[in-house]
Regions:
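Conserved "right-hand" nucleotidyltransferase catalytic core of DNA-directed polymerases
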Residues: 1-197, 203-209, 216-219
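Poly-acidic low-complexity segments
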Residues: 32-33, 121, 231-234, 243-244
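Cytochrome P450 catalytic domain signature, combining two hallmark sequence patches
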Residues: 48, 106-113, 227-241
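Alpha-helical structural context
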Residues: 57, 104, 226, 251-252
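Secondary-structure transition/capping motifs at alpha-helix termini
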Residues: 61, 229-234, 252-255
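Short, solvent-exposed helix-helix connector turns and helix-capping sites enriched
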Residues: 93, 133, 229-232, 243
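Cytochrome P450 core scaffold surrounding the K-helix E-X-X-R motif
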Residues: 221-223
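Generic long, charged, amphipathic alpha-helical segments
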Residues: 240-255
C-alpha cells in the first residue's frame, strides 16, 4: 500500500480550527432569555412609537392610478375622471420611504438598484438626515429596529427561536467561505450589535468566566505572521505602527 504524503501545514491547521469550532457549537452560548424578551418588548414599543410619529406626519403614499371606464355612483366613480388610490404608509418599505422623501422633501437619490429604484439603507438615510431632511433619521431608526428584532425574536434564525430549554444557543461556525474566511449560521453570531443591551444577553455559564478578544484586522495580522519569515517582520511593523491601507494605496497609485 502506498504511503500517503503528510498533510500540508495549512490543511492540518484548518482541521484544528474545525475541531475547535465543533466543540464551540456543541457547548453553545449561555443565553439570558429573560433579558432578551425584555429587550425585544422594549424595541417593539420603540418601533411602534416611531411608526406612529411617521404616519401622523405622512398617513398615505401614492398607489395605483385608476381611470374608470364607466360611471359607478355607489363607488363614486365617474367615467374619464382619473384618481389615485392611496396606500397606508409602511415606514419600513423602501419604496414608500423613497416616495415620501422625493415627493415632499425634494430628495434626489444618488444610487440606484439594478432595476432603477433608489437605494434606501440606513447609511443613506442617516446621511440624508444630516443634510437637513431630519425625517430620514426616523425612517433609518425603523429599519434598524426591525433588523434588530429580526435577530432577537422575529427572524427565521432569531436567537430566542433557536435557544434551547437549557438556555443555550448552538450556532454553527466553519471555514466555509470560498476565501477561507469563517461563515456563521443558525444563528449568525458574528453580527451581534456592539450595543451593550445586546452583548449582555450572552453570558458565561454559571460558575464559569467568559473571556473575549478583539479580532479587528485578524486576517492581516495572520498574513503578517506568515510573511515574517520572508520579510523579517516588515509587513507586521507597518500593520502595527503605520497605515497598511495607505501603503497599499501608494503602491498602486490611488493615494
Amino acid at each position: 500500500m502506498p504511503t500517503l504524503p503528510p498533510l500540508p501545514d495549512w490543511v492540518a491547521l484548518e482541521h484544528q480550527v474545525a475541531h475547535l469550532m465543533t466543540k464551540q457549537e456543541l457547548h453553545g452560548w449561555y443565553f439570558n432569555e429573560r433579558a432578551a424578551w425584555q429587550l425585544a418588548s422594549a424595541l417593539q414599543k420603540e418601533l411602534e412609537e416611531t411608526k406612529k410619529v411617521l404616519r401622523e406626519r405622512h398617513p398615505f403614499v401614492e398607489g395605483a392610478t385608476f381611470n374608470p371606464k364607466r360611471n359607478n355612483k355607489t363607488q363614486g366613480y365617474f367615467q374619464g375622471c382619473e384618481s389615485v388610490r392611496l396606500k397606508e404608509l409602511n415606514p419600513t418599505s423602501r419604496d414608500h420611504i423613497a416616495w415620501i422623501l422625493s415627493t415632499f422633501y425634494g430628495w434626489k437619490p444618488t444610487q440606484l438598484t439594478t432595476t432603477g429604484k433608489p437605494v434606501i439603507d440606513e447609511t443613506i438615510l442617516m446621511e440624508t438626515a444630516s443634510a437637513g431632511i431630519t425625517i430620514a433619521g426616523d425612517f433609518a431608526k425603523c429599519l434598524d429596529i426591525t433588523k434588530k428584532l429580526g435577530m432577537i425574536s422575529e427572524g427565521t434564525n432569531a436567537w430566542l427561536k433557536l435557544c434551547t430549554t437549557a438556555s443555550r444557543v448552538h450556532h454553527h461556525c466553519s471555514v466555509g467561505c470560498a476565501t477561507f474566511r469563517m461563515s456563521h449560521k443558525n444563528p449568525n453570531l458574528a453580527q451581534v450589535p456592539s450595543d451593550p443591551r445586546f452583548r449582555q444577553l450572552f453570558v458565561p455559564t454559571p460558575g464559569q468566566v467568559m473571556v473575549g478578544a478583539d479580532l479587528a484586522g485578524i486576517e492581516l495580522r495572520m498574513l503578517a505572521h506568515y510573511l515574517a519569515r520572508y520579510d523579517d517582520g516588515r509587513y507586521a511593523d507597518i500593520l502595527l505602527n503605520g497605515d497598511i491601507h495607505q501603503v497599499n494605496a501608494d503602491k498602486i497609485g490611488i493615494s
